[in-house]
């Protein structure tokens, strides 16, 4: 028996008059007075379902085929023929229908064939991939992740698997999930009455990582061009459409590099992956342009075909202070820009992605390289129209004395960064990198407004279902 996916049949990879079996889930079933049934079957391989024309002559027609409802899983064997209907190139003339699984109560099936709100779908995260929108999001998510790996491979980067469990805080913000096997009802204490983490599994405090950057820097300082792509965690009590407690980060690191080098890398990567998703997922992108954001395709094309605008933080502050827009958050040199400021710059002032550079040192992380003016650091953010910050990066502080000064200023425990300081003691080298929040990238490409709808099982404050 020859099996085929829906996408292979619809794109002509299966020859006309060939008999194949397609397996998937029933979207709809319609019975005609002529004694045939039309079943729309999807398997997730593409946006469209395939139509199977099922004749009443099949032995299980009355007792099974006519009882099929949305969500039932089946295998339909049939002959591939040119479709007689509109909107589809090929269909199946069924010769056999095998039912794998029934929907026990069709009246209470959560994914009934109608339009559901995104909030409703979140309650059924285990079933929402069967909907048009979540299926399309996940195919685009896959295309983007594959394109990212392909881009870095073609550029000569090595993928490094950085640890999820860590003992250091990359961002220095303290918003970390603790990893512990201590008995919460019988916590060991030190002589000072503090928690005795020497009794814990790792013999010290351990956390879920907020970033793989510090670890991947170690490998950049030996292998030159590396990146990590994996899950990260923030115990930040932000219940917004832009925040997740568990999300994926893309973090390249490049030795012998400046801020401008990684700014160019970020631009090249975004153009590469946007071009890839437009070429590989035209069906899904057409859906997003029609139903979610009419600019979904055109704005990606604009990014692919135009240069990013480079702008200094100081210049951006002057632009924001002198514009006629009333912002909720006041603008002064030294403040961290809010989403409303970033989006104004990218959407209204420039109308294109911006690489914003050279931020005040006091609002940035300890590891960012201090500029000669002593007030700013060689940091950058990539601001995209429609979402704001999508990438953050910097040149790293390779001078041990200045790095130590920053660690002390931020009251960070220097002993926890011993391995990081060693990189500056043994053959230090200028290097730079950036971090891309992968879910924000997926949200930007698809036009989906809430970041919880672009990851399979979202984790957020008071929300860890499934």
From Swiss-Prot:
<dbReference type="InterPro" id="IPR006195">
    <property type="entry name" value="aa-tRNA-synth_II"/>
</dbReference>
<dbReference type="GO" id="GO:0006421">
    <property type="term" value="P:asparaginyl-tRNA aminoacylation"/>
</dbReference>
<dbReference type="Pfam" id="PF01336">
    <property type="entry name" value="tRNA_anti-codon"/>
</dbReference>
<comment type="subunit">
    <text>Homodimer.</text>
</comment>
<dbReference type="GO" id="GO:0004816">
    <property type="term" value="F:asparagine-tRNA ligase activity"/>
</dbReference>
<dbReference type="InterPro" id="IPR004522">
    <property type="entry name" value="Asn-tRNA-ligase"/>
</dbReference>
<dbReference type="InterPro" id="IPR002312">
    <property type="entry name" value="Asp/Asn-tRNA-synth_IIb"/>
</dbReference>
<keyword id="KW-0963">Cytoplasm</keyword>
<dbReference type="InterPro" id="IPR004364">
    <property type="entry name" value="Aa-tRNA-synt_II"/>
</dbReference>
<protein>
    <recommendedName>
        <fullName>Asparagine--tRNA ligase</fullName>
        <ecNumber>6.1.1.22</ecNumber>
    </recommendedName>
</protein>
<keyword id="KW-0547">Nucleotide-binding</keyword>
<keyword id="KW-0067">ATP-binding</keyword>
<dbReference type="InterPro" id="IPR012340">
    <property type="entry name" value="NA-bd_OB-fold"/>
</dbReference>
<dbReference type="InterPro" id="IPR045864">
    <property type="entry name" value="aa-tRNA-synth_II/BPL/LPL"/>
</dbReference>
<keyword id="KW-0648">Protein biosynthesis</keyword>
<keyword id="KW-0030">Aminoacyl-tRNA synthetase</keyword>
<keyword id="KW-0436">Ligase</keyword>
<dbReference type="GO" id="GO:0005737">
    <property type="term" value="C:cytoplasm"/>
</dbReference>
<dbReference type="GO" id="GO:0005524">
    <property type="term" value="F:ATP binding"/>
</dbReference>
<dbReference type="Pfam" id="PF00152">
    <property type="entry name" value="tRNA-synt_2"/>
</dbReference>
<dbReference type="InterPro" id="IPR004365">
    <property type="entry name" value="NA-bd_OB_tRNA"/>
</dbReference>
<comment type="similarity">
    <text>Belongs to the class-II aminoacyl-tRNA synthetase family.</text>
</comment>
<dbReference type="GO" id="GO:0003676">
    <property type="term" value="F:nucleic acid binding"/>
</dbReference>
């Amino acid at each position: 028996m020859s099996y085929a996916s829906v996408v292979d049949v619809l794109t002509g990879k299966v020859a006309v008059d060939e008999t194949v079996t397609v397996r998937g889930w029933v979207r709809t079933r319609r019975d005609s007075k002529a004694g045939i049934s039309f079943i729309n079957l999807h398997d997730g391989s593409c946006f469209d379902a395939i139509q199977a024309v099922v004749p009443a002559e099949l032995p299980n027609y009355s007792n099974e085929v006519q009882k099929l409802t949305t969500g039932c899983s089946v295998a339909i064997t049939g002959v591939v023929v040119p479709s007689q209907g509109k909107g589809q190139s090929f269909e199946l003339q069924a010769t056999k229908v095998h039912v794998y699984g029934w929907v026990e109560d069709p009246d209470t099936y959560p994914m009934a064939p109608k339009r559901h709100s995104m909030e409703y779908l979140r309650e059924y995260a285990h079933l929402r991939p069967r909907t048009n929108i979540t299926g399309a999001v996940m195919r685009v998510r896959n295309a983007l992740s594959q394109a990212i790996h392909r881009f870095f491979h073609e550029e000569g980067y090595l993928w490094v698997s950085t640890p999820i469990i860590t003992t250091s805080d990359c961002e220095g913000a303290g918003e970390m999930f603790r990893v512990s096997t201590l008995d919460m009802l019988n916590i060991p204490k030190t002589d000072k009455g503090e928690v005795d983490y020497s009794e814990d599994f790792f013999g010290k405090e351990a956390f879920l990582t907020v970033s793989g950057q510090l670890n991947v820097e170690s490998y950049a300082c030996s292998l030159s061009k590396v990146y990590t792509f994996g899950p990260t965690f923030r115990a930040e009590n932000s219940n917004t459409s832009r925040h997740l407690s568990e999300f994926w980060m893309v973090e390249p690191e490049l030795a012998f590099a400046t801020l401008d080098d990684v700014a160019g890398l970020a631009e090249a990567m975004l153009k590469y992956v946007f071009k890839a998703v437009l070429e590989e997922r035209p069906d899904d992108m057409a859906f997003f342009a029609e139903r979610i954001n009419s600019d979904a395709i055109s704005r990606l094309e604009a990014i692919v075909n135009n240069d990013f605008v480079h702008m200094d933080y100081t210049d951006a502050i002057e632009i924001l202070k002198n514009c006629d827009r009333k912002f909720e958050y006041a603008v002064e040199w030294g403040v961290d820009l809010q989403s409303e400021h970033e989006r104004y710059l990218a959407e209204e002032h420039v109308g294109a992605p911006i690489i914003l550079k050279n931020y005040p040192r006091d609002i940035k992380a300890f590891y960012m390289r201090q500029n000669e003016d002593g007030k700013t650091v060689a940091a950058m953010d990539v601001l995209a129209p429609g979402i704001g910050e999508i990438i953050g990066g910097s040149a790293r502080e390779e001078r041990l004395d200045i790095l130590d000064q920053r660690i002390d200023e931020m009251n960070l425990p220097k002993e926890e960064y011993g391995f990081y300081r060693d990189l500056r003691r043994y053959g230090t080298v200028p290097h730079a990198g950036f971090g891309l929040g992968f879910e924000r990238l997926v949200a930007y490409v698809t036009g989906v407004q809430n970041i919880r709808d672009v990851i399979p099982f979202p984790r957020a404050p008071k929300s860890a279902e499934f």
